[in-house]
Structure formats: C-alpha cells, structure tokens
Amino acid sequence: MTSQPQVRHFLADDDLTPAEQAEVLTLAAKLKAAPFSERPLEGPKSVAVLFDKTSTRTRFSFDAGIAHLGGHAIVVDSGSSQMGKGESLQDTAAVLSRYVEAIVWRTYAHSNFHAMAETSTVPLVNSLSDDLHPCQILADLQTIVENLSPEEGPAGLKGKKAVYLGDGDNNMANSYMIGFATAGMDISIIAPEGFQPRAEFVERAEKRGQETGAKVVVTDSLDEVAGADVVITDTWVSMGMENDGIDRTTPFVPYQVNDEVMAKANDGAIFLHCLPAYRGKEVAASVIDGPASKVFDEAENRLHAQKALLVWLLANQPR
C-alpha cells in the first residue's frame, strides 16, 4: 500500500502553521457563537472516534461536536475492536478510510499515528497521545483569546506570557511549548530537575518560536512566574504512570499553583487546567475555585475548538 503524504492530519501542534492555527481559532469563536452554522458532515456522514485510553471530556466533546456538524460519531474502545490485536494499524486505517470522513484517536504511543497515517486517506486527529495533546491546546488558546484578547482575536496572543508548573516531561508540557509558540506566546515550563521536557520537544518549540517571535524557557525557578498572563498546571500523575515506581508527589510540592504563586503573575492573570484536577495537590482549591480560574470555560472550549478543527481539516484536503 502506498503512503498518503498529501492528506492533512492533525497529529501534533506544529502540523498547523501559525496562520492556519489562527484560522482554526477564529472559526472556533464563530462556532461558539453559532453552534450549528457549519454542517460539513450533513447526511449524516460518520467519524470514527477511537479510544485506547478512557476519557470524559474527549468523548463527550467529540461526540457532541460531530453531531453539531451534522454527522455521526462511531465510538469504539480498544476492547471492542481488532486494533492492535493482530491486524496492523496500516490495514485498520486503510479500511476505516473507506467508511468514515475522519478518524479521531486517543492512544498511548505517538508512533501509532504515524503507522496509521501511512495508509489513511482521511484526516487523522490526535485527541491525545503519550507525547502530545494538541486538541487541548486549541481549546486553551481559545480560552485565552476570550479573556485576554477578545477584540484582537488570535493576533492578540503574540507577546503574551504563559507559565506551566509541575511535570514538564509529559504530553501537556510538550504541547504547550509547541502550540503556544505557534501562537506567538512566550511559554515557560517551570519544573524540577529530572522532570523537565525532552530536548526534541524544546527544539520543536524553539523552531516555531523563531517564526513567531515567541520565547521558550525551561527552568526550575518559580521566579519565572513573574510577568505571566496565564498560569497553568496539570495532574502530577498522568494516566498510565500510577504504578511506574517514580515518586511523582514529593518533587512537585513546591510547584503547586496556590495564591502565593498567582500573586507573582500579572494582575488579571488567568488560571488553566485541562482537568481532571486534584485540589490540594497540583492546585489549591482557592485558585481553581477562585475568580482567576477559567477551567470550565476551557473544558467547554474543547467542543468548539475541535469542531473548528474538523471543519478546517475537511475543507483543506486535496481534491
């Protein structure tokens, strides 16, 4: 079987150029204001939504969003298909491409996407892998635009500063670096030694920052919170790491996002968390339940940003 390099997929944050990312974010705002204004899946046409990892927000937001676009979500978990059980991912993608308009997948190894992309003739969407979580970043950027750049739109993100505290060696930190740098935002990963991002992801973010003017910083110093417009954290123990034998609590205690940390940020700074959150662990209840917190707007924006992404991908495939 031949590869399909011309198909536009969204497997990583840098699969969109800065201009394309801005287009998606602008469309997301439109779809939030007019949820049923785009119906590219009218028919209904189908989208495969595949889960190797369990989810709440990903499943509900994609299922509802596909319905809003006029389509039908075929939701399948790993226990009810042959994926990874003898049939190759290449064969699976080739077959599914005959049935559906797009494939959305939440999986473990990021390399799985590259295997499916070899034969998929429809767009693949990474709804989460061990390396990256690019759909979440689109929702976060939409939330930041709403709160910090409502008049300018995505263009107003340029020069804003975001800081992420906690485990810097996970998919969220990787995507924040690349996705925010794509938007022209300065992004700082504040994490203890031994839990900082891998060089390959820092380099990808820096490369994108060279295009947009964004600065990428990796440090263990909380002083870096100064000047932040956005403060972000994530769970200290990501899914699948519960029993890896590594102490994922003690090193992160100094990096909890609490009132003291928020006081270091700019006046009017907002707090984001992709959820689920553990109050008293990575974030104090006073922060996540306080006025700076936009976590539920952020969760809602998964719906709108992912709809915009699907509309954009379906409209930008080779004819």
UniProtKB/Swiss-Prot annotation:
Keywords: Amino-acid biosynthesis, Arginine biosynthesis, Cytoplasm, Transferase. Pathway: Amino-acid biosynthesis; L-arginine biosynthesis; L-arginine from L-ornithine and carbamoyl phosphate: step 1/3. The keyword Cell cycle does not apply. Transmembrane segments: none annotated. GO terms for cellular component: cytoplasm. InterPro entries: Asp/Orn_carbamoyltranf_P-bd, Asp/Orn_carbamoylTrfase, Asp/Orn_carbamoylTrfase_sf, Asp_carbamoyltransf_Asp/Orn-bd, Orn/put_carbamltrans, OTCase_ArgI. One of its GO terms (biological process) is arginine biosynthetic process via ornithine. This is Ornithine carbamoyltransferase. It comes from Corynebacterium glutamicum (strain ATCC 13032 / DSM 20300 / JCM 1318 / BCRC 11384 / CCUG 27702 / LMG 3730 / NBRC 12168 / NCIMB 10025 / NRRL B-2784 / 534).
